[in-house]
Amino acid sequence: MRLRKVKNALLKINQSPYFYSKDKFAKFTKKQLVLELGCGKGTFLIKEAQKNNNFLFIGIEREPTIVLKAINKINKLDFNLENILLLCTDAKQLDDYFQAESVQKIFINFPDPWPKKRHIQRRLTSPDFLKLFWNLLVKNGLIEFKTDNDKLFEYTLTTLQENSQIFEIIHQITDLNNSEFSFQNSITEYEQRFMELEIPIKKLVIKKII
């Protein structure tokens, strides 16, 4: 379904206290940093921020309209979240915003699988992105990756094997909701739909090494 863009969305999100700026980010220097790439409407991000007050959660989205939807969801909560920000940018620009070895964890939930060969480098688990994430993560930092797409999952496994000098797979799960890890799983909007359709969710937990 094509996204219906909101007029002046970028202006509106810039007026929100939840929208990323260097000044706002600087106030959280004592909190450990967690990123979610492709945070959508913010359902997963909100759940994680609720559970982990000692961390700063930053949701990343390219499209201002989607960032605005996430901000609106946060604004409608009946409680305050003081450890969450939204950033409107492309994932390949992350090193413009965050220093090397400053991120504790990166969540990649149901990214676009970019099935065509000519778009392989756009996949968030391509070698170039893995190297970017490795640079941003602290020592022993983690990536948590979830997908419903079998081909993307297999591609990611292959890419990680080819980059085993910088990352190792800690957990490999082929049916998350019927695994021992299901109880601690925060569910995204997409994930809820897949669960209703009984589509298995695949997950990898990946650790930075060296």
UniProtKB/Swiss-Prot annotation:
It catalyses: guanosine(46) in tRNA + S-adenosyl-L-methionine = N(7)-methylguanosine(46) in tRNA + S-adenosyl-L-homocysteine. One of its GO terms (molecular function) is tRNA (guanine(46)-N7)-methyltransferase activity. Its EC number is 2.1.1.33. S-adenosyl-L-methionine binds at residues 36, 61, 90, 112. The active site is at 112. Pathway: tRNA modification; N(7)-methylguanine-tRNA biosynthesis. Substrate binds at residues 116, 148, 188-191. GO terms for biological process: RNA (guanine-N7)-methylation; tRNA methylation. Transmembrane segments: none annotated. The keyword Metal-binding does not apply. CDD domains: AdoMet_MTases. The keyword tRNA processing applies. It is an enzyme of class 2 (transferase). SUPFAM superfamilies: S-adenosyl-L-methionine-dependent methyltransferases. One of its GO terms (cellular component) is tRNA methyltransferase complex. Disulfide bonds: none annotated. Keywords: Methyltransferase, S-adenosyl-L-methionine, Transferase, tRNA processing. Catalyzes the formation of N(7)-methylguanine at position 46 (m7G46) in tRNA. Belongs to the class I-like SAM-binding methyltransferase superfamily. TrmB family. This is tRNA (guanine-N(7)-)-methyltransferase. It comes from Mycoplasma genitalium (strain ATCC 33530 / DSM 19775 / NCTC 10195 / G37) (Mycoplasmoides genitalium). The lineage of its organism: Bacteria, Bacillati, Mycoplasmatota, Mycoplasmoidales, Mycoplasmoidaceae.
